[in-house]
Each structure stands twice: as structure tokens, then as C-alpha cells.
């Protein structure tokens, strides 16, 4: 096991409560690091809300230790919540070891995600691997998976090293 990702949390109503989560993630990340495992957090749309006047996602990035906690940015939910992943890459460089790559249906299906620009900034983000998910199926699952894999494998902006 190389990576462990926390897939969800309910967003607390106070920063004090959110800090408890961040401290917990730091401790888990420290224990994982001692075993050679990277620990990260995966966002959804609900992290892009204000808690006591501060964006929860930013608060989490600011209150977790980069050495112990990385972020698997869900590009779809970041964009769908009217945020720009590039702003996060620039503000928190190196924190996004995994990209959760998805679109409304198969990858590239909506043409609204801007994957070319996102992947062209992957080095700033700290990307090690993209992880593909399909949000909604319009075809059989295996066909969707193949179409998404074909899209990434053919995309000139996706480094060959990610195509393992």
C-alpha cells in the first residue's frame, strides 16, 4: 500500500470542530508516514463552503502538515463548485499528489473541465498519479471505463509516466 485516502467527512459548523479533524488527519498522516505510506484527503463539493467566514477546503489545506497530509483533489467537484483547480495549485503547490479525474459522464464528455490546462499545471500541483472515476454512466460500466482510459491515453497533455 502506497496511499491511503480519507474519502469523506461531514463538514463541521465551526472552525474549532474543523481543526479537530485537521489535527486528527495530521496524526494519522504521521503514523502512515512512519510506515512509508502517504495519507491524503479526498474532497467533494461540500468542502467548498464557508465555515465561520473561511472556505473549509482552504482551512484544511492551511491546518494540515504537508509532510503528513496530501490532498486528492476531485477536479470535477472543484470546478462544479465554481472554483479553479489552478488557483489551488498555485496557492498550495505540491499538496495534490493524486488527481481525482472525472467529468459528468466519460472523461472529456462535457468538454467543460479544461483537463488540458489542469494537466499542464500538474507539476505545480505535485501530481504523482491521476485516479479516474465516472460520476454518471451513460453506457455500460466497462465501456465508460474504456472510453475514459482511451481519452487519457490519447491526450497529449497527460504525461506518459501517468499511463501505467
Question: What are these model-predicted stretches?
Answer:
Residues 51-73, 77-164:
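Histidine-acidic metal/acid-base catalytic patches
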Residues 1-71, 162:
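Active-site acidic/histidine proton-transfer and metal-coordination neighborhood
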Amino acid at each position: 500500500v502506497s496511499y491511503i485516502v480519507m474519502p469523506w467527512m461531514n463538514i463541521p459548523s465551526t472552525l474549532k470542530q474543523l481543526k479537530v479533524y485537521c489535527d486528527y488527519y495530521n496524526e494519522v498522516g504521521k503514523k502512515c508516514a512512519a510506515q512509508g505510506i502517504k495519507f491524503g484527503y479526498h474532497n467533494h463539493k461540500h468542502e467548498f463552503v464557508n465555515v465561520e467566514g473561511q472556505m473549509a477546503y482552504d482551512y484544511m489545506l492551511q491546518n494540515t502538515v504537508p509532510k503528513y497530509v496530501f490532498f486528492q483533489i476531485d477536479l470535477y467537484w472543484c470546478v462544479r463548485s465554481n472554483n479553479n483547480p489552478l488557483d489551488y495549485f498555485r496557492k498550495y503547490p505540491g499538496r495534490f499528489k493524486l488527481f481525482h479525474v472525472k467529468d459528468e459522464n466519460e472523461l472529456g464528455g462535457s468538454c467543460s473541465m479544461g483537463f488540458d490546462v489542469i494537466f499542464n499545471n500538474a507539476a505545480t500541483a505535485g501530481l504523482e498519479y491521476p485516479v479516474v472515476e465516472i460520476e454518471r454512466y451513460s453506457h455500460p460500466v466497462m465501456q465508460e471505463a474504456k472510453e475514459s482510459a482511451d481519452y487519457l491515453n490519447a491526450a497529449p497533455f497527460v504525461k506518459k509516466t501517468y499511463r501505467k
